[in-house]
Design a protein with these regions (language model features):
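Intrinsically disordered, low-complexity terminal regulatory regions
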Residues: 1-73, 152, 156-161
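Sensory-domain boundary capping and coupling elements
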Residues: 122-136
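A generic structural signal for residues located within well-ordered alpha-helices
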Residues: 33-36, 80, 113, 145
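Regulatory sensory and allosteric helical modules in signal-transduction proteins
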Residues: 59-111
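Short hydrophobic/aromatic beta-strand element in the GNAT-like acyltransferase core
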Residues: 53, 118, 131
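Well-ordered alpha/beta subsegment
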Residues: 142-144, 149, 159
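A short, aliphatic-rich beta-strand micro-motif
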Residues: 115-123
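A generic structural motif
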Residues: 138-140
Length: 161
């Protein structure tokens, strides 16, 4: 049985990520099923930070297809280079969007989303195999601290792809 996520009583993201990372490593320890692993990681991130939507889109041919997530119903498919997720996939880099209404071609899966961060996950050959997508109802809710920490989370997920 999986142990519950335990966190310090703080809103400081550095402290929260520091406490969460070993717990994510433990969630992934000896878990080889990508669906199970991605489901637990999305739950751990949403539980820790309370973001509106946390989940994964997997590369399937020429589009991203929704995978495990926590939050409201999501867009099912996103084209290469479309929206924030498709752009992060195409450009193979983390994208932080402080105000989604200002992002050209933003795909509004939820009208409540104000800011977003998308982090690519690479396979063993270095190709983008999936993306981690996180939406917040707060404007400018993500910064480089989040980007760096979430990139570390995605590195832990690489062996699943």
């Amino acid at each position: 049985m999986q142990e519950p996520i335990t966190l310090p009583p703080t809103k400081d993201r550095v402290q929260l990520f520091t406490a969460l990372m070993p717990q994510i490593r433990e969630l992934l320890h000896e878990e080889h099923d990508p669906i199970a692993a991605l489901a637990n990681v999305s739950a751990a991130l949403r539980q820790t930070f309370g973001w509106h939507w946390v989940g994964f889109y997997r590369v399937m041919g020429a589009e991203l297809v929704v995978g495990p997530f926590q939050g409201p119903v999501a867009c099912t498919r996103i084209g290469h280079g479309k929206g924030v997720c498709g752009t992060a996939w195409k450009e193979e880099r983390t994208i932080i969007v402080p105000e989604v209404s200002a992002f050209p071609g933003h795909i509004a899966c939820s009208p409540l989303t104000r800011s977003e961060i998308v982090v690519p996950i690479r396979d063993s050959d270095g190709r983008v195999a999936a993306v981690l997508d996180i939406d917040s109802i707060e404007p400018a809710d993500f910064d480089q601290v989040d980007g760096h920490a979430l990139e570390q989370v995605c590195e832990l997920l690489q062996p699943l792809f």
